[in-house]
């Protein structure tokens, strides 16, 4: 309902504006309280890069984190990640993810990052404590990536990237709850990189384009890998911030599901729920983020799409140059 108000043409947002003004006041107060030293900002012995959003979910932030981890690991840097762990709930934080971790406690995105990359991942609502736990476990990290957390100002950051979806952009431009904005659009003036997810003819000067590119589909039970190709008899599901993006991507690659089903972001699935969605020889196709939560009860007709990020070579050099110079600065001082 709210997403239709935020990204559609409905005037219902007008009724929510008073609440947005309250949110905006406290959001601004929170930021300036750290900016002017009224509240403590915690700095660590390694550089920290935050990859976040100005809006609520579904912008492609986590794929961007995965891309950056791969780029840095390829260059020999030791990388750690901290995350809030949305969708998870635990009695004890921070959590250092390992082979026994489950998404119900640590969240789906941190578990996905760990499984894809193998880097140390620390989860906590308090990112300062998450970083401390990470460095206690591995003091020799070269850099730490914060998956989201742009508004977590208690954590000092050396570099900030903001990911913007090319289609949804900033919706109606209003603060929560009348709109999707966590902060004003002017916040873009203070970040080191604006990453536009998807093709766009109208981008900010200096912004960098990224594209989500499906590489293969992978079976949840057997691990079999197949190339992306036109498929029939497919039921597609997505429990992410912007499910329609996943379905549109499938169509771009010749996959036209007989049925598409949207779930809320971080939705927790059950075997009974998903097994009832297909019949006969139909394939159940989902995002990798969904698959992370289904591995323990998956059926052999369940597959997920492996997606990579594609960024132009010159833009890649530009992004990594700033990061590597920051890492070297910390090592020399």
UniProtKB/Swiss-Prot annotation:
<keyword id="KW-0808">Transferase</keyword>
<keyword id="KW-0547">Nucleotide-binding</keyword>
<comment type="similarity">
    <text>Belongs to the LpxK family.</text>
</comment>
<dbReference type="GO" id="GO:0005886">
    <property type="term" value="C:plasma membrane"/>
</dbReference>
<keyword id="KW-0441">Lipid A biosynthesis</keyword>
<keyword id="KW-0444">Lipid biosynthesis</keyword>
<dbReference type="InterPro" id="IPR027417">
    <property type="entry name" value="P-loop_NTPase"/>
</dbReference>
<keyword id="KW-0443">Lipid metabolism</keyword>
<keyword id="KW-0067">ATP-binding</keyword>
<keyword id="KW-0418">Kinase</keyword>
<feature type="binding site">
    <location>
        <begin position="55"/>
        <end position="62"/>
    </location>
    <ligand>
        <name>ATP</name>
    </ligand>
</feature>
<dbReference type="GO" id="GO:0009029">
    <property type="term" value="F:tetraacyldisaccharide 4'-kinase activity"/>
</dbReference>
<dbReference type="GO" id="GO:0005524">
    <property type="term" value="F:ATP binding"/>
</dbReference>
<dbReference type="Pfam" id="PF02606">
    <property type="entry name" value="LpxK"/>
</dbReference>
<comment type="pathway">
    <text>Glycolipid biosynthesis; lipid IV(A) biosynthesis; lipid IV(A) from (3R)-3-hydroxytetradecanoyl-[acyl-carrier-protein] and UDP-N-acetyl-alpha-D-glucosamine: step 6/6.</text>
</comment>
<protein>
    <recommendedName>
        <fullName>Tetraacyldisaccharide 4'-kinase</fullName>
        <ecNumber>2.7.1.130</ecNumber>
    </recommendedName>
</protein>
<comment type="function">
    <text>Transfers the gamma-phosphate of ATP to the 4'-position of a tetraacyldisaccharide 1-phosphate intermediate (termed DS-1-P) to form tetraacyldisaccharide 1,4'-bis-phosphate (lipid IVA).</text>
</comment>
<dbReference type="InterPro" id="IPR003758">
    <property type="entry name" value="LpxK"/>
</dbReference>
<dbReference type="GO" id="GO:0009245">
    <property type="term" value="P:lipid A biosynthetic process"/>
</dbReference>
<dbReference type="GO" id="GO:0009244">
    <property type="term" value="P:lipopolysaccharide core region biosynthetic process"/>
</dbReference>
């Amino acid at each position: 309902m709210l997403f239709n108000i935020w990204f559609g043409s409905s005037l219902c947002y007008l009724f929510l504006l008073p609440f947005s003004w309250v949110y905006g006041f406290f959001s601004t107060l929170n930021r300036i309280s750290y900016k002017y030293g009224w509240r403590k900002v915690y700095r660590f012995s390694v550089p920290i890069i935050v990859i976040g959003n100005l809006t609520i979910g579904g912008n492609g932030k986590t794929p961007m984190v995965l891309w950056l981890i791969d780029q840095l690991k390829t260059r020999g840097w030791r990388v750690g990640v901290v995350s809030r762990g949305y969708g998870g709930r635990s009695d004890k934080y921070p959590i250092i993810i390992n082979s026994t971790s489950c998404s119900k406690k640590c969240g789906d995105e941190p578990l996905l990052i760990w499984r894809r990359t193998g880097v140390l991942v620390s989860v906590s609502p308090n990112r300062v404590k998450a970083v401390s736990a990470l460095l206690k476990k591995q003091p020799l990290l070269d850099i730490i990536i914060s998956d989201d957390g742009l508004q977590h100002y208690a954590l000092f950051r050396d570099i900030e990237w903001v990911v913007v979806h090319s289609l949804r952009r900033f919706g109606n431009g209003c603060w929560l709850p009348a709109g999707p904005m966590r902060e004003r659009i002017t916040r873009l003036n203070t970040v080191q990189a604006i990453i536009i997810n998807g093709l766009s003819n109208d981008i900010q000067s200096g912004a960098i384009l990224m594209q989500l590119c499906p590489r293969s589909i992978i079976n949840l039970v057997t691990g079999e890998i197949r190339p992306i190709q036109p498929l029939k008899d497919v039921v597609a599901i997505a429990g992410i911030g912007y499910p329609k993006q996943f379905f549109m991507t499938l169509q771009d690659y010749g996959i036209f599901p007989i049925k598409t089903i949207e779930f809320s972001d971080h939705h927790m699935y059950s075997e009974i729920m998903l097994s009832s969605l297909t019949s006969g020889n139909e394939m159940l196709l989902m995002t990798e983020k969904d698959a992370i939560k289904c591995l323990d009860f998956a059926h052999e007709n369940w597959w997920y799409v492996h997606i990579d990020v594609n960024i132009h070579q010159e833009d890649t050099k530009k992004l990594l140059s700033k990061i590597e110079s920051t890492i070297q600065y910390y090592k020399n001082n």
